[in-house]
Curated annotation (Swiss-Prot):
Gene name per UniProt: rabO
Lipidation residue positions, type S-geranylgeranyl cysteine: 215
Record carries keyword tRNA-binding: no
A single Gene Ontology CC term: plasma membrane
Compartment annotation: Cell membrane
Name the UniProt record assigns to this protein: Ras-related protein RabO
Organism annotation: Dictyostelium discoideum
GO biological process: hypotonic response; vesicle-mediated transport
Residues of the propeptide: 216-218
Amino acid sequence: MDIDNSILIRVVLLGDYCVGKTTTGFVFDGKQFDFSRNCNIGVDFFVKHIVVDNQCVRLQVWDTGGQERFKTITRSYFRNTSCCLLFFSVDDQKSFENIDMWYSLAFEKYDLLNYPVVLVGNKIDLPQEKHVITKKMAEEWCKNQQTKLNLKFSIPYFETSAKNNININEIFYSAAELGLKNIVFKNNNNNNNYNNNNKLNGNKEIQNEKNKGMCFIL
C-alpha cells in the first residue's frame, strides 16, 4: 500500500441520534466498542488507509455523533466532503422519515447537492418483528431521490449491523469508491472549463489582433 501517494477521501456520517453512526465507525476502525454505552455527543473523526480500485485511499471519517440534537452543525463541517453516509435504524420509523431532513441539510443548505451519498439501514440484527423499514422502502427512497433531483450518482443502499459486523466494510468502501468517482468527475469538469475558457480567451485575442490590423475608410 503506497500511503505516500494516497488520495484523501472525506466521509461524513449523518443521521438521527442513536441510529448507530458512532458504533459503526468504531467497528470499521477495528476498535472495541461497549454497545451498552450512551450515544455519542460531539464530533469526532478517524483516518484509515484502504485500497480501492488499486488506489490507496486515506479515508477520513467524520462522525457527527449526537451533535445533531443541538442543531449546531455548520457549513465548515462539510467543507471538502467527498461522500456522506446517511443512517437510519430499521426499527425506527422516525429516523427513516428524518433522512429527508438530513439530506436537505447536507445537500441543499450546504451546497452539496451533487455529492455522492450511501444510504445505511442499521440494526438489522434486531428480531425481524421489530423491523418497520423494509429494504424495498429504502431502495424506493434512493430511486426517488435519483429521479427527482437528477443526481449524477445513484444512491446505493446497505442494510448493516454494527453489533454483528454486517456490511460495515462494504459501506465505507462504497463511499470511498463514490468519492474517487466524484473527484474524477470534478477534475474532468475543471479541465473542460479550463479548455473552454482558454478557447474563448484565444478567440478574443485573435479578434483583438484582427481589429488592430483593420483599416477603416471614412
